[in-house]
A protein has these predicted regions:
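P-loop NTPase motor core
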Residues: 1, 9, 26-92
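The conserved Walker
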Residues: 12-13
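Conserved lysine of the Walker
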Residues: 17
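Hydrophobic positions on the alpha1 helix immediately C-terminal to the Walker A/P-loop
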Residues: 20
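Substrate-gripping "pore-loop 1 plus following alpha2 helix"
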Residues: 34, 39, 155-171
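Conserved P-loop NTPase mechanochemical-coupling segment
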Residues: 67-74, 78-121, 149-158
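Substrate-engagement module of ASCE P-loop NTPases
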Residues: 87, 123-134, 161-182
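Conserved P-loop NTPase "ATPase switch" module shared by AAA+ and STAND
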Residues: 135-159
Length: 183
């Protein structure tokens, strides 16, 4: 069975999408030891599946739920903050000898919220490339509330600007990305 590269889960609000993605992140993340968490559940009976997938892949899990603002600059600042917080969870990457030096420099800027717009737009694919270099495995990308920045922008009058930012950020991460296992 071929796994689709990108899957979009569309369900109503309060349907459990965030919980499901959090569970998937715990299951896949190579930095976790989730055996006890899933012990006794039906999935733990699938030994081959667990051997192949449980804690076997670098996993990026982020949410855009807080990227909101009455003006574009505020929303962009919250997007920078979201990426900075994500970088803080992966600071081990800048200690590695196998990670590109230029990426490390950009990573530091993203982490301190000192990046420019193109660096912010390329942040997810850059993080994925760093993780792939570090682990020598493709990355599983889980994005929650991906539509919030654009929906909030639409209701606050900066739709075009936010669409440009999010389109660049997501298309580079999701389309023709060799560091992507699936999203």
């Amino acid at each position: 069975n071929k796994i689709p590269e990108v899957t979009l889960i569309t369900r109503p609000r309060r349907f459990g999408k965030t919980l499901a993605m959090s569970m998937l992140a715990s299951f896949f993340d190579i930095r976790s030891d989730s055996k006890k968490l899933f012990q006794g559940l039906n999935i733990s009976k699938e030994q081959q599946l667990c051997n192949d997938w449980m804690n076997q892949y670098p996993t990026l899990f982020l949410s855009f739920k807080d990227v909101d603002g009455t003006i574009f600059e505020n929303a962009l600042g919250l997007l920078q903050f979201t990426i900075a917080e994500l970088c803080k969870k992966h600071t081990y990457l800048i200690e590695s000898d196998v990670v590109d030096q230029d990426d490390k420099e950009t990573f530091r800027k993203l982490k301190s919220m000192g990046s420019n717009l193109p660096e912010l737009q390329g942040s997810i694919i850059m993080l994925m490339n760093m993780m792939k270099a570090y682990y020598n495995k493709p990355v599983i990308l889980l994005i929650d509330e991906y539509d919030v920045p654009i929906a909030k922008a639409s209701s606050n009058g900066y739709y075009k600007e936010m669409l440009e930012v999010m389109k660049a950020m997501l298309s580079t991460a999701l389309k023709d990305n060799e560091a992507l296992k699936f999203a």
